[in-house]
Amino acid sequence: MAKFSQCFACEHSRIESLAGISEPIQAPTEILRTADSSHGLVADEAASLFAAARDPDRKDEIQLAANQVRARWAPPSVEFIIPVYLTSFCQNECLYCGYRHSNPIAERVHLSLEDFNTQLDLILSWGYRQIELVLSDDPEFGPERVARYVAATRRKLEALGGGEVALCSPVYQQEDYVRLREVGLDWVVEWQETYHRSHFDRWHFAGSAKRDYESRLDLWDRAIAAGITRIGMGVLLGLYDFRYDALAVIEHGNYLRRTYGIEPYALGIPRLKPARGVLASQKPNRFSVSDEDFRLVVSVYHLAFPTSRLFFNTRESYDLNMSLVAAGDLFTVDCETLPGAYLRRHLPGQFSTHDYPPRKEVRATFERRGLAGKYLAEEMPCEIARTTPAAGTAIDEKRWASEHAQLRARLQDWEMALERLSMNGSQPLERQAADASLREILEYLKTVLTTHCREEESELFPAFCEDAEASPKLACFRADHERFGVDLDKLERQMASYGLSKDPTVLLTLGARMIREMRAHLEAEEQLLPSTRRRAVG
């Protein structure tokens, strides 16, 4: 069996060199002139376009050529697709992901087959006929268990006249893909994350199953050998230099052309976005991809693979995606990244997403452009839709008051520990006592506070999601929760740093701010409770 990992080991240095060129090695005008064919681009041609685009005026020229190529070779349609998450438990430590194993604030859910079927009935009633099953690397969700969910999806789609089943999962072996194909899987989605080996290792901690770089590179060879020839490939833009990774994707796609006569079925274009409780994703890094460079990558992909579907998702704003999507692409409108969250809206998931207009409105916009909306049928009545949690859900105020009292008591303990540290931090015994107290408080916050935040999102958010007065506060609460997760990560790092430096300055400043913000959050939360609002009115 062919292996791309062996091929890429020989091509890596060439791709690295191509990514760094500052001047085109081929005339961009000639590349764009000959690009009006179904043959696409090779890495050298794409590298010349990236180099030419260092001149901003060239970017519009490249995008115009890409749109013309798509209009000629791709079908006049856009395919709708909806992700359905099965589990948020994960054994991996990917520094950018909200579901990384050590993230204390991540909501962990296994979606039972019964709940999956209930949610799928709701999704199908909305008209969706292309379903992407998504799961993290959960040892309890092996390929045989996933096969049951694939089979259930296939049965329901066939009962409605057919549709497509895609899967984004951990990498599997050839026999696993055979089994999944037999029960109804149509195509597989998998992102390499980054093709750069050393940066791949930096983003994925040792001990993670995902750290097996070669196995990930070769998964398409295994899937194709298993009879799955429709594949979605790509990278997570922002983990390394976007030119290198985009060129590596193009090299991989051309390998599939040469070796198997297969075009990539879809190309992923996700950008690194903030994830709850994940410090590495919260701020730009030197590889962050600007909107203009994102547009460039999309245009070059459109030229490189004129018939492949670019996978537009809700990580990006609606306006940005609508300015880039072209004939033949994939488009996501509804996106919940927590298992079961379509039944209970407004719950946090794997990463930050944008709200989009209603699916009917989006389809109508495409139709006005001359693009038919595929895999989105007319909506049907569904009893499940009326049982989705709504505003006005009863709230157990006594339980909330008790939890708030406990949290306030621990915040006071924390404040006292910081005060002792500021006064006596230079004395070894006092330092040891303060350190032990702070570590106990940190562990408490990582469990109790994060649980409280999750309960707030699962109970208060549905209860007040349609309340015009409360909605702005809910948006602030979600931002608070994300900041708390990041701050807990920072606090843990600062405690380790203090143990080495013996300088408590940063620890004291960070702790004081966190205490102040948590108290303000609890007070704002209490202002939402019905009894408080009644007293305010009275």
Regions found by a protein language model. Give the residues of each.
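N-terminal pre-triad scaffold of radical SAM enzymes
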Residues: 62-103, 108-134, 186
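Auxiliary Fe-S-binding modules of radical SAM enzymes
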Residues: 1-54, 124, 258-391
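Catalytic cores of alpha/beta
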Residues: 173-182, 240-254, 317-327
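Conserved, mostly hydrophobic/aromatic
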Residues: 38, 66, 94, 190, ...
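Small-residue-biased structural context
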Residues: 389-538
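Active-site beta-loop-alpha junctions enriched in small/polar residues
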Residues: 85, 136-138, 168-172, 193-195, ...
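Glycine-enriched alpha-helix->loop->beta-strand junction motifs that scaffold or abut catalytic
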Residues: 180-187, 227-229, 306, 325-332
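Core AdoMet radical
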Residues: 101-115, 123-223, 230-232, 261-268
